[in-house]
Amino acid sequence: HSQGTFTNDYSKYLDTRRAQDFVQWLMSTKRSGGITXXXXXXXXHADGTYTSDVSSYLQDQAAKKFVTWLKQGQDRRE
């Protein structure tokens, strides 16, 4: 149950973070006067790649912390 709760909370965090990143990107695009369609596709792809890389990194870190937490819990039971 705790793993499901952790996963659900983490998924919500990632969704919120992606939404914040997208809003920030929109705001910076508006401030800069917009971008061309070709540059928009390249920038959106780069932003998506960056977001994907960050998400993967955060998921890896969360998984490592969770495994460590599980191991510590097992040590206490023994």
Swiss-Prot record:
GO molecular function, one term: hormone activity
A cellular component annotation (GO) from this entry: extracellular region
Keywords attached to this entry: Hormone, Secreted
InterPro entries: Glucagon, Glucagon_GIP_secretin_VIP
SMART domains, per the entry: GLUCA
Keyword Secreted: yes
Induction of the gene: Produced in the A cells of the islets of Langerhans in response to a drop in blood sugar concentration.
Highest taxon, organism lineage: Eukaryota
Keyword Secreted belongs to the record: yes
Cellular compartment(s): Secreted
Family: Belongs to the glucagon family.
Remarks, miscellaneous: X's in the sequence were included by homology with American goosefish sequences.
Listed name of the protein: Pro-glucagon
Species annotation: Atractosteus spatula
